[in-house]
Amino acid sequence: WRLGWVAAPEKYIKAMTNIQSQTISNPTTFAQYGALEALKDNGQFPAMMRKEFVKRRDYIVEALNSIKGVRCIKPEGAFYAFPNVSYYIKGNIKNDVDLSAYLLEEGKVAVVPGSAFGKEGYIRLSYATSMENIKEGVERIKQALEKLG
């Protein structure tokens, strides 16, 4: 659930209300309470989460780069790693879509083919989960890729 608000000069607010639909004008009560708690936080929770995401990012990049044939540069934006896995696109694995399906079947890890984002030979992984899940997921990917040689 997401909740947002705008602080702007009156002329902009008036223009926004002219195009805004009723579907976004009455947020649910629990979302309003969540927003209130976020505003009371003074930025402590976001700062803590930024540190946590840096740890997760650094771990997943290092762990992926330790796998033979996988190269991952450190992302600077959202919480996704985007490693190059073209080394494993051979034989029965014809493309990153096949590799993603293989990782799901063999490793029980869901990844998104890079071709969905215009980059064939890559996969996208989210690190918006616990460190424990990240470690297990990367280990499963490693074991599955080792079977491919």
Regions found by a protein language model. Give the residues of each.
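PLP-dependent class I/II
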Residues: 1-149
